[in-house]
Amino acid sequence: MIEAECITKNFGDFTVLSDVSLKVKKGEIYGLIGYNGVGKTTLLKILSGIYRADSGTARINGRSVYENPQMKQKCFFMTEEAAFFHQFSLNKMRKFYSGYYPKWSDETFKGLVEWFGVDPVMKISRFSKGMQRQASLILAFSTRPEYLFLDEAFDGLDYSMRRQICEMFRYYVETEEASMLVSSHNLKELEDLADHIGMLCDGKLAFDGSTKYMRENYQACEFIYKEDMSGLLSVRHELLEIKKCVNEEYRKNRY
């Protein structure tokens, strides 16, 4: 289980995260929604052991990941940036990653290369943005991680490919009993994928509940989000933006 307890992180005088707590259970996909700059990437970096929290604790199965190479070998953090060297091919990146991750699977690598239809000998710098995102996913899942941290995983992918990748995510998490934390600024993407949703706003977790609850009680979720943001000048604008992200079907069911 991935667990954050009262996480706070500052950069100078700026507080990026304030008292954030969440849990991602085994076999669960947790979706973290929030606008750009609210601290999503920072939280993922803390939970995956890249950053150290200023206060609070980040643990996986009760153990800290920060400065813990053994635990990091069970994790994969895919950022918005590339998970590869641009002048390398996928085959060269395979050699790079297989030397670090003990559970690396050539079988998974070959299967995903074929499934995505990318050229494993071409320099990744020649790939389109969408193909580069696919390359990152190939490398991520070939490490056979127990804990996945995906930052804006669908960036650059078309709708059809997003649907297929969602199915792949769900299949992997279910069959491997993995834990996945995926962030996005698009609520619809996460609503279709995640078992659990967390709404990060102004460095705090405004809502933390099951996707099923959010679907069935949209007004309650909106109320919770509004209460949490009652002191901000941009409440009305941000609530309108959240509404735009919600499927029209759920709007109709509100009445």
Task: Give each language-model segment a name.
Residues 159-161:
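Helix N-cap at the start of a conserved alpha-helix in ABC-type nucleotide-binding domains
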Residues 148-152:
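Catalytic Walker B motif of ABC-type/P-loop ATPase nucleotide-binding domains
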Residues 48:
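Helix-to-loop junction immediately C-terminal to a conserved catalytic motif
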Residues 79-132:
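ABC-family P-loop ATPase nucleotide-binding domains
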Residues 56-71:
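Conserved ABC transporter NBD signature motif
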Residues 33-35:
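The feature captures the beta-strand-to-loop junction immediately N-terminal to the Walker
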Residues 166-250:
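ABC transporter nucleotide-binding domain
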